[in-house]
Amino acid sequence: KGERTWLDFMAPVERFVYRICGIDPMQEMNWKQFLKALLTVNLFWFFWGMLLLVCQGWLPLNPDGNPGQSPDLAFNTCISFMVNCNLQHYSGESGLSYFTQLFVIMLFQFVTAACGMAAMAGVMKALAAKTTKTIGNFWVFLTKSVTRILMPLSLAVGILLIINGTPMSFDGRQTLTTLEGGEQVISQGPAAAIVPIKQLGTNGGGYFGTNSAHPLENPNAFTNILECWSILILPMAMVWAFGFYIRRRRLAAWIFGVMLFAYTAGVIFSVWQETGGSRQIEQMGISQKLGSMEGKEIRIGSAASAMWGMTTTVTSNGSVNSMHDSQTPLSGMMQMLNMQINC
């Protein structure tokens, strides 16, 4: 609404962006101009991503020598991350270089989240003003979504992840000797820069192939809570922002209440199912005292895995800390229901 906030210290950065991009922040747009700007920025970044993914074998920050993606795989990757789907037909350790992880995947995760927030800001302004003749400036909404929300939160979450063991380096793979005497190759890289926006932007595309089930992407119980919180915070906040902006906070409270009730009920049901274990597996003589642990990480456990499964599907995030197809049938049903409701 143009009111002063404590995040106004980012204004010089925003003015710099407007200046170098030739943007007039005072120019109002109608819905056609707004839509044209949204489609234009996404089209530009699509071709940017295609070029870098296909050519990544010749680009810097590739200590492991990962080759470029085939054109069809690059097309799939770009479309997937451009529409905030984050379907991955590759494994990040071998399918991408550090350069493309940062300047394609991480960039797209910021851009798509910011585009969604900018689009919602335009809708909210139109509803508040009861007109589509002027719905704000898309470029201003896009820029402020990044500088005032996504970047500060990502920085804070990233620092906490680094403290807890998530790597932030540009070194290549390390070969280690295990306790059994065998060798294991450990991939690393700038994971702590990418995981925060993966969660905060409800993106979901993992840095590593196994996503947040990987111990370097989600090292312990604290990071599991942090990443789960990161999934929820902005979708929840946007409901209240909607009510604030159109001056109907009671409506926002009702919407939030319905969403929270459905989410809480789903979490309770799924946790009950997963911690109860599988009767079929128990009949095979395998203890189910820890719950149904098939496809789950010991450091996370069945209850936290169940809660994550519900959290990631109610928000269309898609990240995982366990294998959802290994959860009990009724938990899987709840996750499918969440995805269908989101559609």
Where are these regions (language model features)?
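Membrane-proximal intracellular helices of multi-pass ion channels
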Residues: 1-343
